[in-house]
Amino acid sequence: MSFMNFEPKPLADTDIFKPIKIGNTELKHRVVMPALTRMRALHPGNVPNPDWAVEYYRQRSQYPGTMIITEGAFPSAQSGGYDNAPGVWSEEQLAQWRKIFKAIHDNKSFVWVQLWVLGRQAFADNLARDGLRYDSASDEVYMGEDEKERAIRSNNPQHGITKDEIKQYIRDYVDAAKKCIDAGADGVEIHSANGYLLNQFLDPISNKRTDEYGGSIENRARFVLEVVDAVVDAVGAERTSIRFSPYGVFGTMSGGSDPVLVAQFAYVLAELEKRAKAGKRLAYVDLVEPRVTSPFQPEFEGWYKGGTNEFVYSVWKGNVLRVGNYALDPDAAITDSKNPNTLIGYGRAFIANPDLVERLEKGLPLNQYDRPSFYKMSAEGYIDYPTYEEAVAKGYKK
């Protein structure tokens, strides 16, 4: 292994290392570990890995006052469809999450759980095997031929969820949020980005409904806002957040190709700001930058340059977490962190650098990540990345 080939800059004297209040917590700095899918949970059961997960989160929360957002976790079995991603609905799952939350808190850092519902990005055959539906906003609006073939082969065609099923998903979000808070989490992040179920309702490419959940900008936003309102009522606005990817194309979303989507996200943010002015301000809004339109592309590939996320500041006046290719572009991180109430998320860099916050603070070189091990069921590429001192001792070079 080696260090990444770029010139880091010390960020200690920038806005990134100023404290900020998020919900009920006081962060020492604005470097955030965003949700990172790692596929190490046990199957069956979707249980966080009892051998490795606590150590993984302990390592990355070692700098006191750091905000950690967990990998996406399924609120219910129906929300899932990936065998090795964790859930938060069973006691067996929650028993492991409690250990993870304790490890993070023992480091004097903070933890938010991302609540993740796949919709049509699930594997239809996995769901069929478990007696579960293959859900989305609309019937049989598949991402592509492979997904269609998989669904038909497993006799589990894509199903546009009914109003009663929408209500059940909302109950699932609420139940999961309460369980996470009761287990010791500081808050929850509702995943409404990257082409997953809530994003499928927001985007007209996947939402072909003709009822009150489809058609207009207001209708397409209804499900998302109902989830937010229900979770806020259950655990408090200060413990609730949400993620969007306005320009993302992952999951065959429209991204920048459909100009109505900027208006769509501006509308949702405006509705959240209305609620904030009425005393229910979310802890933060998490935005994936157009610098990353798909999580499977290397740095600076797939960069959509026809728009920016700057519009958020005209609408939403609360905290903003911005995520996307900041590790190799410290100047962009410095510039964007000058915006009001802004935090910066580092994804792949946090995977490969357990002491990332200290490295960013001091301008130290970063470990090169190993992409093939991102989703590999092993400790390798998960809990064996060295700290800077360990890397130097091993002879790492650029």
From Swiss-Prot:
Its EC number is 1.3.1.31. Substrate binds at H191, N194, Y375. The keyword 4Fe-4S does not apply. SUPFAM superfamilies: FMN-linked oxidoreductases. FMN binds at T37, H191, R243, R348. InterPro entries: Aldolase_TIM, OxRdtase_FMN_N, Oye-like. Homodimer or heterodimer. This is Enoate reductase 1. It comes from Kluyveromyces lactis (strain ATCC 8585 / CBS 2359 / DSM 70799 / NBRC 1267 / NRRL Y-1140 / WM37).
